[in-house]
């Protein structure tokens, strides 16, 4: 079935892009979409507690956003900007580099105040090895900036270090926020536990490819970027138990969806550690996930394709049109949907 990327386009008024977070995490709005009937209803995010039951399992991604934007220069003084993509070891890392002229393999360049050597280049990705005493973790800690997405059109500010991070973030490695999780305050997490709803954590480190628009006309010929995930054995046990007892597996965010569906590709959820480049678009089957919380996604993105696979493209486009008419806030710092 030929599916055009343009079929996942929609017109969004620019003023609905949320460049700043609300004062309180859980003060956002929640659009509830029944994927069977297409019924849409408007709620506050704190109402989510009423949509879940004891016996349900919520699966969160506990990846932590790195202070991945760094600056530096060539030995000539020419300015460089880095977006750290993946850390191999404390002195060795993959990074994007923004420069007037690309640094050559074998050359030495500065990452902030520390010298590094360009070991390799693959497409737009460089492999750097730090020559000085500091490691990449120290450099990020001392100089790093939160890598806000380009559509926010602003530099990061002090509050972003906290607000572009979930309250349960633990495992450092993402270059973008786990946006569905940003709505969960510590109070709401406590209410969920008090209600007898079970919680589990997987890890998927979001790469910068998450911002990459689909550039081919035919959806199926798009090549997904690979990201590192971990779905531990105890999470698989909880999922099997939940299903056996008639509860629902509810994922918080598309990263949790992609992780669980990778681990459940053979129809049975199994522990998984490694890379995934799973691409979920209409026609693909979901073996694990019963419901999800997710933000509103960019036009023509792989993420709007994922939610369209879960709930049917026409229903998603209708829900987005409703959200625009009702002045919902879009993207990373925006409002959320509950699709069930």
UniProtKB/Swiss-Prot annotation:
SUPFAM superfamilies: QueA-like
Pathway field: tRNA modification; tRNA-queuosine biosynthesis
Stated family: Belongs to the QueA family.
Stored InterPro entries: QueA, QueA_dom1, QueA_dom2, QueA_sf
Protein name (record): S-adenosylmethionine:tRNA ribosyltransferase-isomerase
Record's subunit section: Monomer.
EC number(s) on file: 2.4.99.17
Gene Ontology, cellular component aspect: cytoplasm
Reaction(s) the record says it catalyses: 7-aminomethyl-7-carbaguanosine(34) in tRNA + S-adenosyl-L-methionine = epoxyqueuosine(34) in tRNA + adenine + L-methionine + 2 H(+)
Function: Transfers and isomerizes the ribose moiety from AdoMet to the 7-aminomethyl group of 7-deazaguanine (preQ1-tRNA) to give epoxyqueuosine (oQ-tRNA).
NCBIfam families registered for this protein in UniProt: PRK00147.1, queA
Gene that encodes the chain: queA
PANTHER family: S-ADENOSYLMETHIONINE:TRNA RIBOSYLTRANSFERASE-ISOMERASE
GO MF assignments: S-adenosylmethionine:tRNA ribosyltransferase-isomerase activity
Localization per Swiss-Prot or TrEMBL: Cytoplasm
